[in-house]
Amino acid sequence: MLKLLSEIGPVIAFFAGFFYGGGIQHATLYMLITSVICITLCYVIDKKVSKLSIISTTVLLVSGSITLISGNSMYIKIKPTILYVIFGIIFLMSGIRKNPFIKYALESIVRLKEESWITLSYRTAAFFFFMAVVNEVVWRNFSDETWVKFKVFGVIPITVIFILLQLPLLLKNKLPDSKI
């Protein structure tokens, strides 16, 4: 539950900051503060923070700080693209190296045949590269308001759909001692 809150909390803070706080600058500040609080809570409570959370928060701190200092919203808008590309490369390379990173993230929930982990790695890499392209299209061609709404009402449903589309692979290739 804490992990979910730490992922969704900064997005909610960003959305609220944009629509109720006065635009991208406020939204960025709210998101930065919320992200630091969430990652700190995760560390204090769980005594660990995932590598992906560290990467995500680091990119956010850099792009968010540049946005606040420069007043240019482009930096916060390219943050998702940068993260999606980094994550896409991580999942692609782990699949190529036959050491699927996604296995370590999900193995406590589901146990799969090794080749299924590799397939899931490639699919996840493709998803992240797709999302990088979509983010670029949206922020470059639409208003700030549309981009913010897309981050909340577009990215989350697209991610849920991607996860649901992976269920047949997971169910077909799960090992007998799997939790799902």
From Swiss-Prot:
Membrane topology according to the record: Multi-pass membrane protein
Source organism (scientific name): Rickettsia massiliae (strain Mtu5)
Keywords recorded for this protein, A-Z: Cell inner membrane, Cell membrane, Membrane, Transmembrane, Transmembrane helix
Its job: Plays a role in cell envelope biogenesis, maintenance of cell envelope integrity and membrane homeostasis.
Keyword DNA-binding: no
Compartments where located: Cell inner membrane
Pfam family, one: IspA
Gene: yciB
Family (UniProt): Belongs to the YciB family.
Record keyword GTP-binding present: no
Lineage of origin: Bacteria, Pseudomonadati, Pseudomonadota, Alphaproteobacteria, Rickettsiales
One CC-aspect GO term: plasma membrane
Name of the protein in its database record: Inner membrane-spanning protein YciB
Ranges annotated as spanning the membrane: 4-24, 25-45, 52-72, 76-96, 118-138, 150-170
